[in-house]
């Protein structure tokens, strides 16, 4: 009897411990095929140059980012809980590690109570649709942040979208009257030329709010980037201080959705001031001049303008359909003494459609196509040049969640 009593007590203790501190392994595997066609065109007084490229590839994470992770929490009592999330991104088509990090998608710890929840670590920004705190992206577009480069969501026509940041503090309030408040500060990452929370690192801050009531959901967010003051080096030449200026950037964002029963419609608006990365200009510039020089040049080029994206989701033919269109317009300035008189106009367009069909609660197949177009019209020294990049994607694949 005594041994049975000890056994029952031990099992009870183990059960209580498992209840107080639970850990979950989860993940998503998305593998599919994608056809891409892209066309680059440059027009100037010297003539017209055109380059085309097409590819048919196996891809990972087109519809949903391929990932696995661990998350858990422990009840500390007195209304307090501590939790964590460690999430790895990888390519299911090759097995390669994402972002060269073990937990590149998220590595965070949190404490929650009646006051709300405080998070610390690497995580998604509030404006994203990823991780523990990215609330804005899911209400801004039926495609979220987008399926692929050309099956795009609202972020294609919005500015300065970096989905995750290092050394982040985030506060999420308790919900009251359908409203949740958010605040976030990112101290920047340590590297060879930048130090965390110092002027040599890019720092980031955001505040936002979300309200939900009945069929309506509305979100608003303002974010700001304090850009680093480190030297600008192009072609191994460091520009003299005073010959250029680095402008801090901010964006004002408003999004909402309405579910009328047979369809859910999304609208996202953004005003951006002195933004650097607009319509994917940095990746496109990097492909021409190299990653390092492209980043340096883009630090001097800022864009002020607006973006708008409209999308909808509805059920038909046994599955879920998505469709969206977007437009962006901005004026570009190059903040370098030797390029006075530079004027630039940037426009971007996107149109996408997608279809998802559930095979079970955890498995689905999808297909979609999308078109994007970027235009950069520049005038400098009485010369005009127009660059146009057009892209088309057709994709299909399978997603399994565990």
Where are these regions (language model features)?
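Detector for outer-membrane/organellar transmembrane beta-barrel domains
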Residues: 207-352
